[in-house]
């Protein structure tokens, strides 16, 4: 049994789909997050443990830790440890000890925030901002469509178009961005059925209205200080799909499968084998 771990940078909803799959497959995973995560689909994002101490996604519990020494105890309990380490300092520390099997950058910032191939024996970047063979070993496509989850061995993913993928036949209309600067005060909650024009939140004194009728699939954390134009909410036009607010998306599951495929093809086996 290997004592090496998979480090995943980022704990948003897509990253959490990957992390959940890795954990279920028997890999030891360590999540690294920033101090103030801005996940929208917070009911399926392990990064919420930064605020609450723990976060559960489809029956798997993530626990915030303050030191690497706590990892073993959390893994032993069948949970996933998360540390606030936006610079990735512990990657260097663990790699120097030979305890990192692979590094997955799942921040999905549309650009590389500091991941390089020399950080781990195997490096994987999700989405645009990475070039396979240059700053990471592999890139996994994150754009919805025919090439979703395609494993790229040379070059970058499809550039960010700024247009959200289709959900229920709706694209850009389903995503809501902040109309102003300030602290957000939510008037609706995840999984609420909302009507077009309904006030979902206030950013400072400015109201944020629902762009379409549907299920509020996600909304940024209450009290978050948002800039103009930041994504703050997501509406699913399919009212009957309320349960989807609490489960990993099809997109995340597809990407997760490709990450596992890369690991296995490179001989990185689960810790349980």
Where in the sequence are the language-model features?
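Well-ordered secondary-structure scaffolds
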Residues: 2-273
